[in-house]
């Protein structure tokens, strides 16, 4: 399997955390699922690979459309969760090394996956390899600048006077790309995909405040990495800022209403 230091870091961060993700941020990442499948042309009979399936949200929706689905993920705890939700083949594999023959799928999707790999172009090239000529690939990523829902955690840590770690692995400069509609579109064109389209999806994510807190509190994402390095007293300080800074987002029902956005890009294999 081809990996970079960034890949190794990402996989270590997700190890054993499927339940924590499912109870916190999975609902946020689920929102684009229908649009993602539409962009890839997924309907009854379409042979689809869902790369980085996580808990299987996109794969399960594709199955409900009558697609013939294969779902893969690098993380065993995610696979265990996906197998409970997806009535299709679920196996362990990771971009950019998929165990499939050339052109064996009609479509491929990767929901918030390209932003978690050490070589995004290689990952897209691999998706292109396993999709037949004329098939479509669709991917989502979080944009930069970050939308309010994602900015909120940075504001919380800043208010609590928490410094970001200086040793976190980053993408190599020659592998990175601008997290904008144009940047993502250019990346797809760079690997040889055609008929490239990119839309910005915007929505308001509604979440229970305790669920939204529980993700980082259980090690999910960069906020989770920061949180697990803190003392109990510092965690208390972070929680105080969390409670204070989420007040403007709380509705009458007690839920958070968090404005957010994602980039959805799709392209054809030619």
Residue ranges and their predicted role:
Residues 107-120, 143:
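A short SAM/SAH-binding and catalytic strip from SAM-dependent methyltransferases
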Residues 1-46, 57-61, 77-81, 85, ...:
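Conserved class I S-adenosyl-L-methionine
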Residues 121, 132, 136-208, 252:
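Conserved catalytic/acceptor-binding region of the Class I
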Residues 47-98:
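Class I SAM-dependent methyltransferase SAM/SAH-binding core
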Residues 29, 55-57, 175-270:
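Conserved Class I S-adenosyl-L-methionine
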Residues 96-107:
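A short acidic, Gly/Pro-enriched loop at the edge of an enzyme's catalytic core
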Residues 122-126:
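Short, conserved SAM-binding segment of the class I
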């Amino acid at each position: 399997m081809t990996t970079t230091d960034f890949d190794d870091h990402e996989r270590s961060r997700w190890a054993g955390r499927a339940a924590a993700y499912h109870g916190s941020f999975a609902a946020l990442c689920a929102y684009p699922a229908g649009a993602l499948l539409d962009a890839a042309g997924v309907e009854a009979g379409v042979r689809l690979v869902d790369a980085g399936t996580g808990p299987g949200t996109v794969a399960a929706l594709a199955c409900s459309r009558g697609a013939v689905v294969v779902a893969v993920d690098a993380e065993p705890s995610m696979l265990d969760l996906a197998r409970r939700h997806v009535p299709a083949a679920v196996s362990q594999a990771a971009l950019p090394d998929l165990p499939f023959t050339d052109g064996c799928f009609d479509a491929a999707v990767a929901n918030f996956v390209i932003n978690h790999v050490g070589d995004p172009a290689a990952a897209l090239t691999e998706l292109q390899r396993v999709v037949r000529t004329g098939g479509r690939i669709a991917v989502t990523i979080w944009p930069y600048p970050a939308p309010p829902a994602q900015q909120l955690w940075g504001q919380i840590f800043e208010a609590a006077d928490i410094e970001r770690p200086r040793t976190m692995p980053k993408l190599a400069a020659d592998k990175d790309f601008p997290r904008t509609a144009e940047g993502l579109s250019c990346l797809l064109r760079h690997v040889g995909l055609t008929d490239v389209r990119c839309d910005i999806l915007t929505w308001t994510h509604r979440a229970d405040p305790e669920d939204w807190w529980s993700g980082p509190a259980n090690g999910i994402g960069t906020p989770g990495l920061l949180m697990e390095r803190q003392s109990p007293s510092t965690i208390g300080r972070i929680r105080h800022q969390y409670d204070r800074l989420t007040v403007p987002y709380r509705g009458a029902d007690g839920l958070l209403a968090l404005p957010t956005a994602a980039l959805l890009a799709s392209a054809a294999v030619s």
